[in-house]
Design a protein with these regions (language model features):
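Core segments of cupin and vicinal oxygen chelate
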Residues: 1-2, 7-47
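Vicinal oxygen chelate
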Residues: 3-11, 30, 39-41, 56-114
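A short alpha-helix capping/helix-coil boundary motif
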Residues: 15-17, 53-57, 78, 111
Length: 114
């Protein structure tokens, strides 16, 4: 098994797509014609930016996906430079690696690990 998609709930889908494209510069914007839907493809994992609603609001409320980063300090600095705020950590983990969580402009958590 592997993760194929991460759904991120935001108040403004277009703003969310633009922000996450900046957060993950190697992600490619793709679309489906019927029904029309845009998403980001990051090495085969879909980052699906969808409208928050009464069932699922944006913000920190549960599971967090952690992205492997080759240079932890650089990745954290990049996220903060585009408006993410540090939420938890950084913490030292096994094998000399570090991990943290940052929050996007809608309050959703993004985990970094490397």
């Amino acid at each position: 098994m592997s993760v194929v998609a991460i759904m991120i709930h935001v108040a403004d889908v277009e703003a969310g797509l633009l922000w996450y494209q900046r957060a993950f510069p190697s992600a490619k914007r793709k679309s489906i014609a019927e029904p029309f839907f845009e998403y980001l493809d990051l090495d085969g994992t879909s980052i699906e930016i969808v409208l928050a609603d009464e069932k699922v609001a944006s913000g920190a409320a549960g599971s967090v996906a952690y992205w492997y980063v080759a240079n932890f300090a650089s990745a954290l600095q990049h996220m903060q430079s585009i408006g993410a705020t540090l939420y938890r950590g950084p913490a030292e983990i096994e094998d000399g690696k570090r991990m943290c969580q940052v929050r996007d402009p809608w309050g959703n958590c993004i985990g970094l690990r490397g």
